[in-house]
UniProtKB/Swiss-Prot annotation:
Name assigned to this protein: UDP-N-acetylglucosamine--N-acetylmuramyl-(pentapeptide) pyrophosphoryl-undecaprenol N-acetylglucosamine transferase
Binding site for UDP-N-acetyl-alpha-D-glucosamine: T14, G15, G16, N125, R168, S196, Q297
Enzyme Commission number(s) of this protein: 2.4.1.227
Species annotation: Bradyrhizobium diazoefficiens (strain JCM 10833 / BCRC 13528 / IAM 13628 / NBRC 14792 / USDA 110)
Family annotation (Gene3D superfamilies): Glycogen Phosphorylase B
GO-annotated cellular components: plasma membrane
Amino acid sequence: METSPLILLAAGGTGGHLFPAEALGVELIRRGFRVRLVTDERALRYSGLFSKDMIDVVSSETARGRNPFQVAYAGLTLAAGTLSAYSLIKRLKPVAVVGFGGYPTLPPLVAAKFAGVPGIIHDANAVLGRANRFLSSRVRAIATSLPGVLDRDPALSGKTTTVGTPMRPAVLAAAAVPYAAPEANGPLRLLVVGGSQGARIMADIVPGAIERLEPALWGRLILTQQVRDEDMNRVRAVYDKLKIKAELAPFFTDLPARLASNHLVVSRSGAGTVAELAAIGRPSILVPLPGSIDQDQFANAGVLAKVDGAIRIPQTEFTSDRLASEISALAAEPARLTAMAAAAKGAGRLDAAERLADLVVKVAGL
């Protein structure tokens, strides 16, 4: 109904930002609200809750490096996006704007501040992202996936609520699938993913690790791996040579179901991936993406590693030999895999969308 309150959801155009926004959108629609997504052009390729007529694209730019021309261009682009978002907000009259991180959230959340519309941000990482850090003093409320993210900042901790990471219906369905450890000498299902954009490091390391496994394990292995198009031929050649049952693809649209159907996952440790591993309860070997200013992926992986739900391997230590050793050890210990799955599940939270929706409704004054 056009008369029902509208809530704008703002997110960067990658899965880690979009999927929690989609999960909140599902819950808000269930409660009778209207929702629209404000994002960048990358989001148009994602299927899911948001059809194209529910998406508003505003210009944004990631501020990279210290080149003064790049910084100036990013600033001008974000300013133009803010003006566009302000016009959008005045036209649509939302009761709240909720941001999920990424530079495309800056224009709508800054515009909301100027327009007097309540703003809320959600951050799924163990440390606040750069865009959310900038917005943190400009919004009414902050929601985090993990406890303690802002405990050391008294100016922000008072308006911070820990809610967890909102999960899409597909993840909730996968979370209902119990973990069944591989039987001795039975099939071992291994899933290798590298994040929403794929990861060359997996193509460089994993085939060599599989080669180093005992031949008896080759016959047990059922491998599913995310591989970029440019790496496909060389990766497939290794698995064909070893006669490994392998499904390779640049992207999997049904990743939650695949997480649920595998015995072990090798992955980067983006916030969304870690949250889904915890919600579904699957053991993993996590390789944090290095080089980020805040080392957010290292901290994310630590959430599961600290409870023995995952093995965290820094990229400097991520070699074919090391990975082969870890896979071999886990394959020989089904009970350990079961314990890891239970530990990961214990770190998950399935009611985050409801909790975040409660916060949004409260901040909007409804």
